[in-house]
């Protein structure tokens, strides 16, 4: 069964994308492929640029779209061939989330978005998914 982790931040979407970069790097270190599901093209471009500059000592192999690359960035409704780690920055849960070994939901400061993530937490909990919650609002600040 899919393991679901929630990470709560005190900042905005840009801070969330910084956390995504760290989580991507951590996943790659354990040879896991990642699909980063972002809300729109602007966020996809921003994450793409951040991954290029995130760590000067190592390359993060990534691309926009759902091609079979170690790290894919998409705002599309299709997961492609990915099935290991899904990092979801969209407000809603994709219908195909359960094909992934792990889903990471990131919560950042935006009222409607925060409420959607609360609803997502309830959805997973009611269906018996293993949930982890990490409140990084004091440790991971803008």
Positions of PLM-derived features:
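Glycine-rich phosphate-binding "P-loop"
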Residues: 1-16
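ASCE RecA-like P-loop NTPase motor cores
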Residues: 1-5, 27-29, 43, 81, ...
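Short hydrophobic beta-strand segments
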Residues: 5-8, 33-39, 86-88, 105
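Short amphipathic alpha-helical segment that frequently serves as the phosphate-/nucleotide-binding helix
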Residues: 17-22, 118
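Short, well-structured hydrophobic secondary-structure segments
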Residues: 20-66
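Mid-chain, well-packed structural core segment of small domains
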Residues: 65-102
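Trafficking entry modules
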Residues: 107-113, 117
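Charged phosphate-binding loop/patch that engages nucleotide di/tri-phosphates or the phosphate backbone
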Residues: 121-142
């Amino acid at each position: 069964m899919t393991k679901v982790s929630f990470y709560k931040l005190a900042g905005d979407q840009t801070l969330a994308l910084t956390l995504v970069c760290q989580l991507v790097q951590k996943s790659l270190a354990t040879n896991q492929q990642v699909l980063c599901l972002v809300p729109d093209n602007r966020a996809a471009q921003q994450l793409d640029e951040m991954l290029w500059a995130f760590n000067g000592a190592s390359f993060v192999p990534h691309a926009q779209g759902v091609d079979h690359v170690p790290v894919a960035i998409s705002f599309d409704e299709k997961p492609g061939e990915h099935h290991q780690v899904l990092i979801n920055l969209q407000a809603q849960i994709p219908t195909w989330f359960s094909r992934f070994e792990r889903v990471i939901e990131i919560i950042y400061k935006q009222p409607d978005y925060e409420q959607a993530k609360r609803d997502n937490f309830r959805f997973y909990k009611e269906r018996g998914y293993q949930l982890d919650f990490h409140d990084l609002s004091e440790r991971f600040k803008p």
